[in-house]
Amino acid sequence: SEMCIRDSLRTAVLATQVSKDAFKALEEESDYSSNVEQARILQTDRQSLAEKLSKEAETLSQEEIGDIQRSIQEKSKDLEFIVNKIQTKQNETADKVFRDLNPSVQKILQELIAAKEVKLLLGRENILFSDQALDLTDDVTSMLDVALKDQNSDN
């Protein structure tokens, strides 16, 4: 259940304006955007080859079919490599946002736990009881947005 709480916090943090801005900045990075574009092109090319193969299979020679299949495999491998690069950058961005906002998250969690009188019964390994009706994700997101807006206007 600790994983569930961590996932909820991550979801809350990633829904903040700060996070949205960080991902917008990522999308504007030339390396990242060219990787996304390259992935799009590879996906389209691969799709076209697959369609050609299915439409023209009867008229193509075995050699042509083999060439197309190899080309599809190459494009799939390239696509997988680029998608991994894209996902790595997205994960790095998310991790950085999460690290940067963690002090604010902890403070807000303490306030929410006090305000909502959250009580958890903890076992050695897991949460034995928790109020399922108590999902703090949206509260954390909106409180973070407010807190961070206040911080920025103080600077």
Where would I find each of the regions flagged by the language model?
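Long, charge-rich amphipathic alpha-helical coiled-coil "stalk/tentacle" segments
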Residues: 23-107, 115, 154
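Residues immediately flanking
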Residues: 9-10, 124
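Short acidic, Gly/Ser-rich segments with clustered Asp/Glu that frequently serve as metal-coordination loops
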Residues: 10-16
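Extended, charged amphipathic interaction segments
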Residues: 108-137
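Short, charged, intrinsically disordered terminal tails
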Residues: 145-155
